[in-house]
């Protein structure tokens, strides 16, 4: 199912993998456990960092080849993704239980440093409340994503789903607590250059933008790369078309396998992110309301669709 070369790399990167499902401890959970530092989602949306699971039901399957992706892409190691067969997709109840079990196994590793973590925080981490379905791969390729989200909600979780927006029919169906669409290009040429996608994929993404106003809580995330897509005003028309609740402008980070495709200089500094956010603020319906220097990210809110950012 997963080529051995990719599996070995993912395991070396500390992915827990079971079938087509994977969990990896977010670096911010580690910082919260050991240094009591919160992630930007805590600052922006009020989540408890140490109680968040980072997972995917489709660990290596994605339609795009984004140059900024820190994950290993099949083409990075000479594998044609079209030659990798889709797995036999497991039922959502099975995937849910696997995600919880893998996450618990990771957190239990902190039992050995309980003096640094603290018993209260450790116990809370063993009872997660949030799940980010965003680790690797494209989650909408998992055919039971809607059912999986509902299972998480039934069990008291808030859900964050991050999608490339290609499968409009799936996006229309799902209702996570917060839906993220990654919009990293402003036209077909930039899409091909940055995301390595097909023309029909770009057209599908545009169709998805048109249905986002019907969703309960939405965010567009744009990963900015110096010299590739940092002319923020070229995005304004698409942002207005989507009419989402929030926009996150985030710098590309020179980590993981992206280091083989881009240079360190392609990252933007936080003051540059803020400058672009203020430019967007002055030229659109979206107003700058928060930022996080550690993550080089700025949050803007749609002044025509105001909701409380905090969950």
Curated annotation (Swiss-Prot):
Cellular-component GO terms for this entry: cytoplasm
Keyword set includes Cell inner membrane: no
Annotated InterPro entries: Aldolase_TIM (IPR013785), rSAM (IPR007197), tRNA_wybutosine-synth (IPR013917), tRNA_wybutosine-synthase (IPR034556), TYW1_archaea (IPR023993)
Annotated protein name in UniProt: S-adenosyl-L-methionine-dependent tRNA 4-demethylwyosine synthase
NCBIfam families assigned: rSAM_TYW1
One Pfam family here: Wyosine_form
Cofactor(s) annotated in UniProt: [4Fe-4S] cluster
Residues that coordinate or bind [4Fe-4S] cluster 2: 62, 66, 69
PROSITE patterns assigned: RADICAL_SAM
Subcellular location as annotated: Cytoplasm
Gene name per UniProt: taw1
Organism: Methanocaldococcus jannaschii (strain ATCC 43067 / DSM 2661 / JAL-1 / JCM 10045 / NBRC 100440) (Methanococcus jannaschii)
Gene Ontology molecular function: any one: metal ion binding
Keyword entries, A-Z: 4Fe-4S, Cytoplasm, Iron, Iron-sulfur, Lyase, Metal-binding, S-adenosyl-L-methionine, tRNA processing
Binding-site list for [4Fe-4S] cluster 1: 26, 39, 52
Assembly description: Monomer.
């Amino acid at each position: 199912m997963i080529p051995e070369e990719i599996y070995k790399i993912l395991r070396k990167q500390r992915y827990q993998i079971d079938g087509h499902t994977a969990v990896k401890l977010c670096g911010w959970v580690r910082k919260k456990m050991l240094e009591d530092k919160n992630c930007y989602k805590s600052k922006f949306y009020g989540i408890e960092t140490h109680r968040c699971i980072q997972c995917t039901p489709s660990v290596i399957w994605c339609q795009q080849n984004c140059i900024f992706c820190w994950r290993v892409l099949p083409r990075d190691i000479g594998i044609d993704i079209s030659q990798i067969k889709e797995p036999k997709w497991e039922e959502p109840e099975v995937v849910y239980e696997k995600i919880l079990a893998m996450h618990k196994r990771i957190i239990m590793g902190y039992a050995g440093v309980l003096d640094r973590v603290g018993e209260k925080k450790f116990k809370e981490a063993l009872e997660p409340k949030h799940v980010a379905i965003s680790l690797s791969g494209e989650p909408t390729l998992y055919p039971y994503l809607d059912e999986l989200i509902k299972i998480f909600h039934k069990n008291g979780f808030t859900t964050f789903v991050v999608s490339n927006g290609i499968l409009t029919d799936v996006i229309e169906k799902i209702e996570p607590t917060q839906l993220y669409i990654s919009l990293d290009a402003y036209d077909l040429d930039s899409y091909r250059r940055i995301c390595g996608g097909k023309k029909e994929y770009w057209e599908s993404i545009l169709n998805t933008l048109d249905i986002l106003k019907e969703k309960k809580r939405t965010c567009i995330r744009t990963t900015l790369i110096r010299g590739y897509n940092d002319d923020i005003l070229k995005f304004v028309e698409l942002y207005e078309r989507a009419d989402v609740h929030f926009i996150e402008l985030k710098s590309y980070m020179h980590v993981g396998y992206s280091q083989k495709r881009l240079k360190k200089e392609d990252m933007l500094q936080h003051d540059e992110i803020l400058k672009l956010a203020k430019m967007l603020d002055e030229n659109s319906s979206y107003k700058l309301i928060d930022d996080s220097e550690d993550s080089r990210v700025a949050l803007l809110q749609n002044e025509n669709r105001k909701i409380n950012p905090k969950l």
